[in-house]
């Protein structure tokens, strides 16, 4: 991962294993580097550029251990709110979903089906460090995840443009797991059909749909508000 904000977030969880920094960047991040238990290596600008996946390298890169996250452990704590992204391939949307879930107090984020790697560089940056603050569970079988969530006592709500229930009418005071699919294809039918309800977000303007991040922000905020 790259940049002071992400390295700071990961080091707070004890996940940093090795740090690479240029001579130019080292003085700017002296306090952060001094707090590291991991090995800190000085590297050339050329090496830093090779390690970077951004147009303008930050000069600070860390190798980290992904935090362990297991769905059974998440459910053992009787969560009130979970966000699940299904077939989310765009890293910016995936990272923003993590950030929104963290901001609204969700207990975890689940990525089901063929999703982008949540530790992709763009996804990490979009999460703004929240990926180290909230459990992120990867479950290739999205239908299985829905079944497990319902068995644990959560109502599962699938966001769809043609849902039979309006968000305004949903009972969000109950423990809830939200399902979000990509804007272009939506949720797979075999996954949406397993949910307790298919929910649509009322829209008054000319927009026909919302992307994952926008839909998640609305639905998770509404749930968090009802659960207060």
Please name every model-derived segment.
Residues 3, 89-97, 210-215:
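Amphipathic alpha-helical repeat scaffolds
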Residues 4, 24-25, 47, 67-68, ...:
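Short glycine-rich anion-binding loops that position phosphate/pyrophosphate groups of nucleotides
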Residues 62, 100-104, 118-131, 189-228:
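Structured adenosyl-cofactor binding patch, chiefly the S-adenosyl-L-methionine
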């Amino acid at each position: 991962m790259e940049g002071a904000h992400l390295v700071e977030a990961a080091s707070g969880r004890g996940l940093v294993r090795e740090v690479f920094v240029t001579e130019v960047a080292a003085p700017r991040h002296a306090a952060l580097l001094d707090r590291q238990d991991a090995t800190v290596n000085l590297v050339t600008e050329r090496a830093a550029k090779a390690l970077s996946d951004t147009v303008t390298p930050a000069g600070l890169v860390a190798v980290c251990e992904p935090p362990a996250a297991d769905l059974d452990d998440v459910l053992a704590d009787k969560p009130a709110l979970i966000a699940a992204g299904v077939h989310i391939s765009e890293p910016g949307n995936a990272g923003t979903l993590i950030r929104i879930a963290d901001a609204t107090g969700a207990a975890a984020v689940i990525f089901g089906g063929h999703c982008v790697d949540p530790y992709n560089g763009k996804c990490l940056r979009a999460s703004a460090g929240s990926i180290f603050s909230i459990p992120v569970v990867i479950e290739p079988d999205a239908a299985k995840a829905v079944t497990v969530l319902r068995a644990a006592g959560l109502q599962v709500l699938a966001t769809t443009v043609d849902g039979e229930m309006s968000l305004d009418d949903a009972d969000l005071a109950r423990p809830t797991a939200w399902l979000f699919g990509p804007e272009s294809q939506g949720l797979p039918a075999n996954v949406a059909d397993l949910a307790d309800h298919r929910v649509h977000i009322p829209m008054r303007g000319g927009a026909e749909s919302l992307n994952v991040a926008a839909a998640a922000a609305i639905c998770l905020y509404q749930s968090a508000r009802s659960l207060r």
